[in-house]
Curated annotation (Swiss-Prot):
Family: Belongs to the universal ribosomal protein uL15 family.
Designated gene of the protein: rplO
GO molecular function terms noted in the UniProt entry: rRNA binding; structural constituent of ribosome
One Pfam family matching this protein: Ribosomal_L27A
Source domain of life: Bacteria
Source species: Thioalkalivibrio sulfidiphilus (strain HL-EbGR7)
Protein name: Large ribosomal subunit protein uL15
Annotated segments matching region Disordered: 1-51
Record-linked Gene3D superfamilies: 3.100.10.10
Length: 143
C-alpha cells in the first residue's frame, strides 16, 4: 500500500456540489443563492458584528477595567522552574537563567509543580504553599 493508492470507501464521501453548471444539475442559474438581494451578489455579506445599522452590542456596552502597568514588572515563578538553578537564587539569577523577563523588578514563587532539591531563595517573594514546599525539600528562604 502506498499513499497515492489510498482511497476512501466507495459511497463514503459525497461528491462536491458544482453550482452554476446548467439547468439539469439542479443548481444552475441562481446557483442556490435565490433571487437578487445582498446575499445573491459577489462579496455580499456583512462584516462580523454588523447588526444592520443598529448600534452593535460590542459598542452598546461600556468598556470595563484596565491592564495594570505594574503587572508587567512583577513575574511569577513556579516551583519546578527553580529546580534547574544552582546556588543562591535571587532576582538576578532568575533573569540570567531566562526564567523571568529582563525588565522584571520583582518576582514571586508560587506553589505549582514539584520541587525535589533544596534551594536557597534570597530577596524573592514566596506564597505560603511555596514556602512549605521549599522547606519540605530542605531549602531555605532569606528575606
Amino acid at each position: 500500500m502506498r499513499l497515492n493508492s489510498i482511497a476512501p470507501a466507495p459511497g463514503s464521501r459525497p461528491s462536491a456540489k458544482r453550482v452554476g453548471r446548467g439547468i439539469g444539475s439542479g443548481l444552475g442559474k441562481t446557483a442556490g443563492r435565490g433571487h437578487k438581494g445582498q446575499k445573491a451578489r459577489a462579496g455580499g455579506y456583512h462584516k462580523v458584528g454588523f447588526e444592520g445599522g443598529q448600534m452593535p452590542l460590542q459598542r452598546r456596552l461600556p468598556k470595563v477595567g484596565f491592564n495594570s502597568r505594574k503587572s508587567l514588572r512583577v513575574a511569577e515563578v513556579r516551583l519546578h522552574e527553580l529546580a534547574g538553578l544552582e546556588g543562591t537564587i535571587d532576582l538576578a539569577a532568575l533573569i540570567k537563567a531566562s526564567v523571568v523577563p529582563a525588565q522584571t523588578l520583582r518576582a514571586k514563587v508560587i506553589a505549582s509543580g514539584k520541587l525535589e532539591k533544596a534551594v536557597t531563595l534570597k530577596g524573592v517573594a514566596v506564597t505560603k504553599g511555596a514556602r512549605e514546599a521549599i522547606e519540605a525539600a530542605g531549602g531555605k528562604i532569606e528575606e
